[in-house]
Amino acid sequence: MSYSGERDNLAPHMALVPMVIEQTSRGERSFDIYSRLLKERVIFLTGQVEDHMANLIVAQMLFLEAENPEKDIYLYINSPGGVITAGISIYDTMQFIKPDVSTICMGQAASMGAFLLTAGAKGKRFCLPNSRVMIHQPLGGYQGQATDIEIHAREILKVKGRMNELMAHHTGQSLEQIERDTERDRFLSAPEAVEYGLVDSILTHRN
């Protein structure tokens, strides 16, 4: 997770997006694969977490809530992390909307990706068998006058404290344990993520 007023050009570039064709009463209709899966209440969080991607995910969650506030939403995560404020906008929306958000880690959920993974509805947070999770403290960098650097240093410590509190709440670990474990990068396998409380179980196949 990075704490930064700067925004890198992190938007994912998808050169080839498969199209699917459906037969309807009005003939054939084509969808890109992500739009088709959105109809099944599936959202993908892949790549760096940044503002544009976060806005799209928030919009999709709000749309699905409006469509049916009683049905779960499925958030598939494969992310190395990203900007804290972008991730927090996704997190707050997950907590705000009425449908449960089930989170599934495929590949990796690192940094902000791990934070969003564990923020899913209790009992509905999953890892695929060979995925990995990485937790650590927020990263920050700021250039400017000494007084401004001091202001930003205080702010990143405040953000760190709040993120640790939320992580403790969702995992069931003590705040002190979270503080120790996020002092440096900590990688966890899928079974270790279950034991730690980041997820609830491992998905090996569909029922």
Curated annotation (Swiss-Prot):
Domain of life: Bacteria
SUPFAM superfamilies to which the protein is assigned, alphabetical: ClpP/crotonase
Cellular localization per UniProt: Cytoplasm
GO biological process: protein quality control for misfolded or incompletely synthesized proteins
Main location: cytoplasm
Class of the enzyme per the UniProt entry, highest EC level: hydrolase
Entry annotation: catalytic residues: S111 (nucleophile), H136
Reactions catalysed: Hydrolysis of proteins to small peptides in the presence of ATP and magnesium. alpha-casein is the usual test substrate. In the absence of ATP, only oligopeptides shorter than five residues are hydrolyzed (such as succinyl-Leu-Tyr-|-NHMec, and Leu-Tyr-Leu-|-Tyr-Trp, in which cleavage of the -Tyr-|-Leu- and -Tyr-|-Trp bonds also occurs)
Keyword entries, A-Z: Cytoplasm, Hydrolase, Protease, Serine protease, Zymogen
EC number(s) reported in the record: 3.4.21.92
GO molecular function: ATP-dependent peptidase activity; ATPase binding; serine-type endopeptidase activity
Residue span(s) of the pro-peptide: 1-14
GO cellular component, one term: endopeptidase Clp complex
Biological role stated in the UniProt entry: Cleaves peptides in various proteins in a process that requires ATP hydrolysis. Has a chymotrypsin-like activity. Plays a major role in the degradation of misfolded proteins.
Family membership noted in the UniProt record: Belongs to the peptidase S14 family.
Subunit structure: Fourteen ClpP subunits assemble into 2 heptameric rings which stack back to back to give a disk-like structure with a central cavity, resembling the structure of eukaryotic proteasomes. Component of the ClpAP and ClpXP complexes.
Name of this chain's protein: ATP-dependent Clp protease proteolytic subunit
Source organism: Salmonella paratyphi A (strain ATCC 9150 / SARB42)
Originating gene: clpP
